[in-house]
Amino acid sequence: MAPYHIRQYQDSDHKSVVDVFTKGMEEHIPSTFRHMLMLPRTLLLLLGVPLALVLVSGSWLLAVVCIFFLLLLLRFLAGQPWKEYVATCLRTDMADITKSYLNAHGSFWVAESGNQVVGIVAALPVKDPPSGRKQLQLFRLSVSSQHRGQGIAKALVRTVLQFARDQGYTDVVLETSTLQQGAMTLYLGMGFQKTGQRFLTMFWRLVGIRTIQLKYPFPSA
């Protein structure tokens, strides 16, 4: 297990940070595809359309080709939301991390191992928190696949929690999805509590993938 340390982001980290973030998000595409394949409506589509073609044309070859193209379409649909999300982030906050986080009363940290960035996490103040609360939102948690299982993600979350304590925040909040079971297990194991859920878009509603809202409340002084 290679040693690692956590430090604040520097502009020279940008390319490596974008790489960790992009690969981390794109890893969700296969699991989204598998989730979609298991939906009853998807199974009905994959069986019903080819069977209808066989009944109409009498061609099993046409049915096989149809299944192949339906699978390609589903794979495209599974990947498109994640790719659009990455593209949006790279155009907005991830385009200038120093401006978006370090100069906006938040922070951005990297986990470094062997002179390589292997993990990232960010935090920003919540603009309109509930009355009487001062909340910090955790963003962009990701660890490269080769360095998982070493406690890096937990250490990055702890870094955000300590930053929030030091700055006098009452809560740390975040959002994740039902698809990201590893992240959900991590957060709940560290004391985060579920506070709500929603569908971000109509697509996510159709495929039954919810966004889960979580909160880590600090004890009152």
Swiss-Prot record:
Top EC category: transferase
Gene name per UniProt: Nat8f1
Role description: May play a role in regulation of gastrulation.
Transmembrane parts of this sequence: 53-73
Name of protein: N-acetyltransferase 8F1
Residues annotated as domain N-acetyltransferase: 69-219
Species for this entry: Rattus norvegicus (Rat)
A biological process from GO: gastrulation with mouth forming second
Membrane topology: Single-pass membrane protein
